[in-house]
Amino acid sequence: MKYPKQIRTYCPFCKRHTIHKVERVKKRPRSELSAGQRRFRRILKGYGGFPRPKPEGREKPVKKLDLRFRCTVCGKAHTRGRGFRVKKFELVEV
């Protein structure tokens, strides 16, 4: 899917329609020092199996896109609705 690099859309911070730059956000690596991750590592230690049951069903073939729209006037970024599933994604100059 081809998507424009810049679009004119509503900015909730400026409260008006402005030009926005479109950014695709990648998943960052997990923080190994967060409280939840430290607790999880502690549970995994020693004998015994995994602390949670296996998830039901199957893995989805494609992840949802995480698009951020950054306002060129105020510089703040926001999302617009939920992400959508697409195999190929490309930002193009219009």
Swiss-Prot record:
Cofactor list: Zn(2+)
Domain of life: Archaea
Signal peptide annotation: none
Segments forming a coiled coil: none
Function: Binds to the 23S rRNA.
PANTHER family: 60S RIBOSOMAL PROTEIN L36A/L44
Protein name per its UniProtKB record: Large ribosomal subunit protein eL42
Native source organism of the sequence: Pyrococcus abyssi (strain GE5 / Orsay)
